[in-house]
Amino acid sequence: METFLIRLLQFILAISLLVLLHEGGHMFFAKLFGVRVEKFFVFFDVGIGKWKGKLFSWKPKKDDTEYGMGWLPLGGYCKISGMIDESFDTDQMKQEPQPWEFRTKPAWQRLLIMIGGVLVNFVLALFIYSMVMFVWGDSYFKVSDMSMGMRFNAEAKALGFKDHDVMLGTDQGPFREYANVNGDFFRQIAQAKRVDVLRNGKKHSITLPGDMDMLPMIKTRPLFAEPFIPAQVDSVLGDTPAAKAGIKAGDLIKSINGKPVETWTDMNYQTGVLSDVLAVKNTHKDSLAVRSVVLTVQHKGAAKLDTLKLMLTPDLKLGVLQSTLASYYKPVQEEYSFFESFPAGIKHGWNVLRGYVGNFRYLASADGAKSIGGFGAIGSLFPPFWDWYMFWSMTAFLSIMLAFMNILPIPALDGGHVVFLLYEMITRRKPSEKFMVRAEYVGITILILLMIFANLNDILRWLHLM
């Protein structure tokens, strides 16, 4: 429960900050061009019965804007006079146009008002990434330094890769770091026509088609490629199956129930198989039988193997901390001065945007549609503990995501309004208000259906039905 609350708090804080500044971008340009902003709210003030849904609000003197906070923590909004938006204030649109209204302003001013939020989100992301570079620097594990090489799945081996190949680079350039979170490593392989590896001390080239589908690389388990990390115990937690069986730090797990184990990927895969078996067991006796396993362990400093019988926890945990890349390799640490951090942050932010846009095309496939997530999926991106580096890095990523999603040409989104404004600027013909209202309804319907679909995916994943 504590983990859930920590993630929820991070999610609400990040989304609220991003939406607040996004809407602030709209308001900035609106007020700059003399457009009246009627309301600017953090969280939505959805009314319930006679209650208007406002936690508090105020209206400064000599200001036409009501500022406040609603109760529904899903972002916020600003209501601009004379604009057809999700409020569907058609009564206002029936009245005589006023000089302070959005609809009476030149198309170029309305365009800047509409893209103001996206601009703020993108600039904010670059600024956050720059400050992250300044405060924490950039720490990563260089792929070519991983002397034990990679562990490949069957699909990768069919293309010519072999376990323990050290990945050097592709025809597009050398590999930088391994990170299956943003997919840059896999994207480079998917787009490559040649991958260079170091095999048994000799350079070897593998020919690839150059247009591989990246989605299976990161969705399939085991992954297409991942660093070879031996199944060595980093540390043992107290009063756990491992501690009771005599397993200690430095021990190597060699097999589980007769199945060979070389890496933690192997171990996790086998416990995953047990999890599938456990899911269909109905009795306590049957579940105990599944949890009862036989491990072959090579204790630290010992030549012989030791066979251990133990009972895994109900969630099939051994009770150890696994060795990681940091157990075997020294990360590259790049530090930046205040002024050096800006070009580094901008470069990183641009790469994140380029990768996100590149991955977007996969959503058109069946597997890609299944990967769409709602509030639960976004919240799970945050760590189950409070870490400022992770929080700001994820906030910057969400800011880029919010900017890109909002600029999509869907009515009700900023991008939809931009399309209509560009049409007006090119043809000198303004779409009718009746058409704009209908388009807004269509856009809202699309967004609601997408939100239902995304959150339904979250529920199905939570129920292990996907």
Language-model segments: residues:
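Functional transmembrane alpha-helices
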Residues: 2, 96-107, 220-244, 249-255, ...
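Small-residue-rich helix-interface/hinge motifs
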Residues: 3-93, 405-427
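Alpha-helical transmembrane segments of multi-pass membrane proteins
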Residues: 15-19, 79, 121, 125, ...
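Juxtamembrane extramembrane loops of integral membrane proteins
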Residues: 83-90, 102-105, 148-213, 238, ...
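PDZ/PDZ-like peptide-tail recognition elements
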Residues: 114-147, 183-187, 191-235, 294-296, ...
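PDZ/PDZ-like domain segments forming the peptide/carboxylate-binding groove
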Residues: 132-176, 217-255, 259-263
